[in-house]
Swiss-Prot record:
Binding partners and assembly: Homotetramer; dimer of dimers.
Gene: dapA
GO molecular function annotations of the record: 4-hydroxy-tetrahydrodipicolinate synthase activity
Catalytic residues of the enzyme: Y134 (proton donor/acceptor), K162 (schiff-base intermediate with substrate)
Native organism taxonomy: Bacteria, Bacillati, Cyanobacteriota, Cyanophyceae, Synechococcales
Species, as recorded: Synechococcus sp. (strain JA-3-3Ab)
UniProt site (Part of a proton relay during catalysis): T45, Y108
Protein name per the record: 4-hydroxy-tetrahydrodipicolinate synthase
């Protein structure tokens, strides 16, 4: 299974009342697949999965699937710290005809490496849906070790990993221990180029909401052997990469999309909207990069109001 190069970790739009805005989700999904995204990851960290109900997630999977209409991969965030829940959600995503599932390392209960292996193996054996593992120890409290990844990669449906530990030695070891067809995706926009240099496949991106085509150019330049050009793209985009993590993701990206006119709404509690100095820094970076001149979101807002 080839998920592509640029996979957007899609935000979940909410109404002013805090309910899911499925109409805006469909619009955003359509926009993303025509602006550089090979795939969409729905209901991941950026999609605020911890504060969504399963029923909200299932409906969002369906809405995004229909909006994409086969033009890009749709990967469902069906991970959980309950193995049983993760299996049930993954089966549902398969029934909905999605292209893959993102399985986060179980959080809070801190299983051992043996427990992690059994967790992911059980999910893999319960469904034919291709699985992308998701290692993000800064949020989960436990890290999936390269040796465990290599063992899991022997299972037919476990085809890739989103690596968000920020540890390049771990990425190197995963690449060394896994077959070449096993996909390694950067979980941080700013580490896309370094991970490409270690045999990575692409990125699960937040910034691609705003600069999808540029990220495609970065990765394609590297793939063509034009490493200097890839570095130029990386350095040009680097201030945006950092600004989008000035506070907890997805708070900054939702603020940026609202500035562009998208009706994505605020984050759900316990997250709070971007304010004060952070908001000013983000706005300045967007202005300097010409991203507030984008008319797509504002045009939709005007059309909706009329």
């Amino acid at each position: 299974m080839n998920f592509g190069r640029v996979l957007t970790a899609m935000v979940t739009p909410f109404t002013p009342e805090g309910e899911l805005n499925y109409e805006e989700a469909a619009r955003l999904a359509d926009y993303l697949v025509t602006h550089g995204s090979d795939g969409l990851v729905v209901c991941g960290t950026t999609g605020e999965s911890p504060t969504l109900t399963w029923q909200e997630e299932y409906e969002l999977f369906r809405v995004v699937r229909d909006a994409v209409a086969g033009r890009a991969k749709v990967i469902a965030g069906t991970g959980s710290n309950s193995t049983r829940e993760a299996i049930e959600a993954t089966k549902k995503a398969a029934q909905l005809g999605l292209d893959g599932s993102l399985q986060v390392v179980p959080y809070y209960n801190k299983p051992t490496q043996a427990g992690l292996y059994q967790h992911f193996k059980a999910i893999a054996q319960a469904s034919d849906l291709p699985i992308m593992l998701y290692n993000i120890p800064g949020r989960t409290g436990v890290s999936l070790q390269p040796e465990t990844v290599a063992k899991l990669a022997e299972l037919e449906t476990i085809v890739a990993i989103k690596e968000a530990s920020g540890i390049m030695d771990a990425v190197s070891e995963i690449r060394r221990l896994t077959p070449s067809h096993f996909g390694i995706y950067s979980g941080d926009d700013s580490l896309t180029l370094p991970i490409l240099s270690l045999g990575g496949s692409g990125v699960v991106s937040v910034a691609s909401h705003l600069v999808g085509p540029q990220l495609q150019e970065l990765i394609q330049s590297y793939s063509r052997g034009q490493h200097d050009q890839a570095l130029t793209y990386h350095l040009r985009l680097f201030p945006l990469f950092k600004a989008l993590f000035i506070e907890t993701n997805p708070v900054p990206i939702k603020a940026a999309l609202e500035m562009q006119g998208w009706l994505v709404g605020q984050v759900r509690p316990p997250l709070v909207p971007l304010q004060g100095g952070s908001l000013q820094v983000l706005r300045q970076v967007l202005q300097e990069m010409g991203l507030l001149a984008e008319a797509q979101g504002s045009e939709r807002r005007t059309a909706k109001a009329s």
